[in-house]
Amino acid sequence: MVGIDTGGKIPPEIMRQATEKTAQLAPLEGGHIYSILKQTLEKLALVGQLQVDPKVQAHELTQSVGEEISRMITEQKKLESRFEELVALQHVLRHQPNKTKLMENQVASERQALQLLLSNCLNEIEVFGKVQPLVESVMAQQAAEQAMKETIEREKNTTAAVRQLRNDLREEKLDHEEKMKEKKKGLSTLKEQLKALKMDTAVSTRYLSKDLTAGNEHERRLQRTQLEDLLKDLGLVQQQIDIEKAVHATQAEFLRQIAAKMADDSSNWASRHDGDLAAREKELEMLKQQHARDLIELKKAEEKFKMEQALKKEREMKATEERERAEFEEMRETRRAQAAVIIQAWWRGHKVRMVMSGGGKKGAKKGGAKKKK
């Protein structure tokens, strides 16, 4: 909707509409309206001239009020308190505009605008026989009122929206405060729980520290004891090594003596060879017989082992079988080792005797040849 602008000028759109709606007045109507508007202008001018000065009116009012001061003496105390309040607001009141003066100025400006409008209408009637300025003013005023209504409606809607937003904001604040209270309660509970956990952790840490300290001390004592035992074992091993060295030296000396004695006794091996060979063969035969008996005993032990194995549980069967097999292998290896040692000893002795016997025969043959010569 088009209205009057801030400078008091009528917009071109309203002027165009007023021109379209304004009709030509009849001479009689024009004269009648002209006389009415002229009288109105004269009365407005007279009102402007008869207007009383505000200062004079204020002076007269002051005189009339002075006559009533005696009646208000009894209310002096009340007025003094009010006066103190007014004195406190004096600085603010000084800076406020004079509402009466402002209203009078507004009336004067409206009167001048009306005079100008009526003058324009008179000129328009005299020239064109129309009241177009008056129509334009009325239409502009209606447009301004419509714009004002729309503005007021928008303001109401805006105010309602603001009120609703404020209510929503208030509810949101209340909801937020309620949530914050709940969160504070939860935070307080969590703080209490954290405090309890810290206390429990401190107690547990102290207990674990003492426990670890005691365990470490016990472990150090055990390690110290084990170290002392190992040192003792090391001393014993060192003594055994020294003893072994002494024994080895003694054995070496003994072997050297044996070698010397064997060198001295090598001449006697030829005569002793046959007897030793027979004795070794006899011992070998005895070993074979013993081996055969051992095989028979071994078979019996295996049969007995199988019979006992069937009567035991599966778990004990495996353990017993491994143990007896280990014992059997150890016994057999021992027997074999013993037999191998005996056979090797016999075989070495046999070879030595053969060597010695061969040397003796060669010596005997050489002696016989010499005798023949």
From Swiss-Prot:
UniProt name for this protein: Dynein regulatory complex protein 9
Keyword match Chloroplast: no
Keywords, sorted A to Z: Cell projection, Cilium, Coiled coil, Cytoplasm, Cytoskeleton, Flagellum
Record's subcellular location: Cytoplasm, Cytoskeleton, Flagellum axoneme
Keyword Membrane: no
Positions in coiled-coil regions: 145-200
Gene Ontology cellular component annotations, sorted alphabetically: axoneme; motile cilium
Positions of the IQ domain: 336-365
Function: Component of the nexin-dynein regulatory complex (N-DRC), a key regulator of ciliary/flagellar motility which maintains the alignment and integrity of the distal axoneme and regulates microtubule sliding in motile axonemes.
Pfam family, any one: IQ
Quaternary structure, from the entry: Component of the nexin-dynein regulatory complex (N-DRC).
PANTHER family given in the database record: DYNEIN REGULATORY COMPLEX PROTEIN 9
Transmembrane segments: none
